[in-house]
Curated annotation (Swiss-Prot):
Lineage of origin: Eukaryota, Metazoa, Chordata, Craniata, Vertebrata
Official protein name in the record: GA-binding protein subunit beta-2
GO cellular component: nucleus
Gene: GABPB2
PROSITE patterns linked: ANK_REP_REGION, ANK_REPEAT
Organism: Homo sapiens
Coiled-coil stretches: 345-395
GO molecular function: identical protein binding; transcription cis-regulatory region binding
Length: 448
């Protein structure tokens, strides 16, 4: 059996989890080949959850961080399919827990995407980076928000509190450290007293909670914190937001707030709101609130992608917070008027080209006239030469004395007198008639 066949059989045995077959094939010299997608035997064993097969392959020396055509490692495969025991085996054998595939997604991203809570906990336990961002600028926390998985959200938030993002990957990260407290969970339609909420937060932050630490986050939706500040009527302004007061509601634009807050997600059961301030602890908000300033309960709801805080009728009006836009619209700048200049330049270019073409046409016509005159002149000369030849031919009589001179190579001219010529003609006439002179002999008739 060839090596290629042995490699194919090894891939199939790893896919099916046939440990004995894998050992036999490796003993017979089967190479660690891959299929057309770059999938190795360890990839297949990790994908299909064959623990013993993966262990045999690792002991045999298969690369624990082998890459497919899309840069996925065996750890990616195991995490995506929820095989926690395979994940732990790979990590213990030195697999890169923060390896990224072609989409820049780590094993933690894939485990969060597929709702594998046990794999998420295991990866965080072995030091997975919870601040890593994918190609789409999403962390594992962002994916959990999209998937509405509250359990994984809490796990990731605790891990984010315990980790410090030394090298943020987003385009505009916040460089100032921010304080973060535990998440507040609001049930659908629940009425919460804001004063008690802030006091409980202040108690947690000042009591030295070991889960609270300094972390860094990027700019995100900030409308809820802006609403809290508006309700508190803080003396210290927290933003440069433009507020338009109406009789029954006040709208605060989210893009004018300088704080950070993660998105509010819910699946009909709970709403998870994570509030983060830019270096301003929540205790400072409480100190800036007048005594008895917040005694009104409020309701947190989500309507059509907007976060709405509804306050009962009283001193504080109902407020609707518009979701912060990611990009601020830049003012329109006046474009320079270059249309007229461009048109004039194009017209001048067209005029120059037209003049050049006319000049070339005139030059061509002039040359054609010259050639025509030259041709007529040549025809006239040829006609005159033909007439001369005809006249010469008519003027030559038969038997008249003539002079014929021909060039003979390497022979001097022969002079023949008229008497000698007559004698020769007489001799020849009697026998054969008239004889023409030699064509290559120069003859001249000289009168005696």
């Amino acid at each position: 059996m060839s090596l290629v066949d042995l490699g194919k059989r090894l891939l199939e045995a790893a896919r099916k989890g046939q440990d004995d077959e894998v050992r036999t094939l490796m003993a017979n010299g089967a190479p660690f080949t891959t299929d057309w997608l770059g999938t190795s035997p360890l990839h297949l064993a990790a994908q299909y959850g064959h623990y013993s097969t993966a262990e045999v392959l690792l002991r045999a020396g298969v690369s624990r961080d082998a890459r497919t055509k899309v840069d996925r490692t065996p750890l990616h495969m195991a995490a995506a399919d929820g095989h926690a025991h395979i994940v732990e085996l790979l990590v213990r054998n030195g697999a890169d827990v923060n390896a990224k595939d072609m989409l820049k997604m780590t094993a933690l991203h894939w485990a969060t995407e597929r709702h594998h809570r046990d794999v998420v906990e295991l990866l965080i336990k072995y030091g997975a980076d919870v601040h890593a961002f994918s190609k789409f600028d999403k962390s594992a926390f962002d994916i959990a928000l999209e998937k509405n998985n509250a359990e994984i959200l809490v796990i990731l938030q605790e891990a984010m509190q315990n980790q410090v993002n030394v090298n943020p990957e987003r385009a505009n990260p916040v460089t100032d450290p921010v304080s973060m407290a535990a998440p507040f969970i609001f049930t659908s339609g629940e009425v919460v007293n804001l004063a008690s909420l802030i006091s409980s937060t202040n108690t947690k932050t000042t009591s030295g909670d070991p889960h609270a630490s300094t972390v860094q986050f990027s700019n995100s939706t900030t409308s809820v914190l802006a609403t809290l500040a508006a309700l508190a009527e803080a003396s210290v302004p927290l933003s440069n937001s433009h507020r338009a007061t109406a009789n029954t509601e006040e709208i605060i634009e989210g893009n004018s707030v300088d704080s950070s807050i993660q998105q509010v997600m819910g699946s009909g059961g709970q709403r998870v709101i994570t509030i983060v301030t830019d270096g301003v602890p929540l205790g400072n908000i409480q100190t800036s609130i007048p005594t008895g300033g917040i005694g009104q309960p409020f309701i947190v709801t989500v309507q059509d992608g907007q976060q709405v805080l509804t306050v009962p009728a009283g001193k504080v009006a109902e407020e609707t917070v518009i979701k912060e836009e990611e990009e601020e619209k830049l003012p329109l700048t006046k474009k320079p008027r270059i249309g007229e200049k461009t048109n004039s330049v194009e017209e001048s270019k067209e005029g120059n080209e037209r003049e050049l073409l006319q000049q070339q046409l005139q030059e061509a016509n002039r040359r054609a006239q010259e050639y025509r005159h030259q041709l007529l002149k040549k025809e006239q000369e040829a006609e005159q030469y033909r007439l001369k030849l005809e006249a010469i031919a008519r003027q030559q009589p038969n038997g008249v004395d003539f002079t014929m001179v021909e060039e003979v190579a390497e022979v001097d001219a022969v002079v023949v007198t008229e008497g000698e010529l007559e004698e020769r003609e007489t001799k020849v006439t009697g026998s054969a008639g008239t004889t023409e002179p030699h064509t290559r002999v120069s003859m001249a008739t000289v009168s005696s």
